Amino acid sequence: MIRLLYISTSRLRPTPADLADILRASRRNNAAVDVTGLLIVGGRRFLQALEGPQDAVMTTYHRIAQDPRHYAIVQLACETITERQFGDWAMGAQAGKAPGEDATISASVASLVAPITDPSLRGYFTGFAERQAAA
């Protein structure tokens, strides 16, 4: 199994309906190939972790990378893992408002990622949320 973490920027700020559609499709697609993960959205920025069988994660990531709705896709980490950090989450999620408009995103994300035992992974998500709240 592997875990892949990436960040990207949406071409347009996603509406709540857009995010609901993204999550619905992600959960359906991920469950079908045994991929789990977490998506945090702050304004137009997305931070996402995907974990599961290597072929499934890489296929999912490449499909996401081809999506024209976003750009500046940067892979932050990709590592072999022996256990999942996101359990049975086909795709957990937390959405904030535009950067600087949502001080609660930090607390929400910190609570969401508290069970994650990998401090580096947890730090990516909490750091992202803190930057979104402070921007």
What are these regions (language model features)?
Residues M1-A135:
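Charge-rich, low-complexity N-terminal segments
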